[in-house]
Structure formats: C-alpha cells, structure tokens
Amino acid sequence: PELTPQQLLRYVPAISSLCRVDCKSLFSLDSTNITPAHWITVAQALRDNYAHYDGFVISHGTDTMAYTAAALSYLVQGADKPIMITGAQKPINYDSTDSKLNLTDAFVCACSGQLAGVDIVFSGRVILGTRARKTCSKSFAAFSSINYPDLAILHDHRLMRYIAPDTLPAPLFYDKLDEHVALVKMVPGTDPEVL
C-alpha cells in the first residue's frame, strides 16, 4: 500500500516499451481489509474507462486477490478486453522479489490481444478469475486454478495461450453485490439445522 502506481512502474521500465500506461489509484490499503464496496468501486472504474483503453492491469495484495478476481468476473461479465490482476509475494524493492516478473507478465498479457476477461497473472501462469485460489503463502507459485486448466503460461515474458476466452458482444457491467451471502461448506454429518 505504500507505493503509488507510478513508483511501482519505475521499478520495471521495460513496461513502457510494451504500451502506454495511464495510472489510476482507486485506494491504497492492505488487501485483507478489502470489502465488496471496494470491488464495486473497481468495477465502476473499469466501466467508466472501458472505452478508452485496450486493457487493464490491477495491482493487488495476494491475501484477497482471488476474491477480487471472482467478484470482478461477476461484476464485469463477458469482457472482450483483458483485465489482469497481479501482485507479489515479496515487495518490489526486495532483491528476491517476484513483483517485477508478475507486473511485467500482467502487462504482456494485457497487450497480447490473446486474452480477455478477468484473470490473475502470477508466477508465469494466467488463471481464470473465477477459478483462482491462493493455495500457498510461502511460495512464489501462490495461486492455483481449481478444477479448470490455466488459460495460458508465460516464459521469458512470452505468452502461450491454451484456452480462448469467452466473451460477449458487449460486456455487462453490474454495480451491486449482496453482502448478506455466506459460503457454507457441507461435510458428511453436517446438521441440516445449520442451514
């Protein structure tokens, strides 16, 4: 949360050779504090700027990145432009950071013309936003795609797409979420009274 988007990009000057980047900072907070109201703010910013850009890259903390990717997938349905979400396990100013790789890869994906919709770009993988889950807090390969293959992989900042994105003739933007929804995992022996 302490770096501005412009400061982040200064660590990765190669991105400027990929595309022209305009930065917008919607909020700066630890991702553990994100709420559905923040997701709606991001979706509204995407809607307001959708016609002006070819793609979007969102820098995000890893603790709730998968939740944000899923929420945005439902708030911005059928997007025909890439909306790439990325972050890092280690801060960008560390020698051993994964931030520079992930940020560059996210911009490669956003500029490729091969991807669309909300995806997580992390550790050389492109994961569909509704299928991503953080499965490891200690590894650079922190995210997994649950019950669905990766959309693409990246090697040396080259994209190799496996699955074509699903798009609609025009994206559908939503601006409401019901915050009174709970995820209840059923296990054998669960008392029906719980529901």
Label every model-predicted segment.
Residues P1, D63-A69, S99-L103:
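Short glycine/serine/threonine-rich phosphate/pyrophosphate-binding segments
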Residues P1-R47:
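ATP/NTP phosphate-donor binding region
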Residues T4-I15, L128-L195:
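Accessory alpha-helical/coil subdomains and C-terminal extensions
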Residues K24, T86, V184:
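Hydrophobic residues at beta-strand termini and immediately following loops
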Residues A45, T68-Y74, P192-V194:
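Short, charged beta->alpha transition segments
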Residues D54-G55:
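Structural motif
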Residues S59-K81:
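Short Gly/Thr/Asp-enriched flexible loops that form oxyanion-binding sites at enzyme active sites
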Residues I85-H155:
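Internal gly/pro-rich beta-alpha loop/helix module
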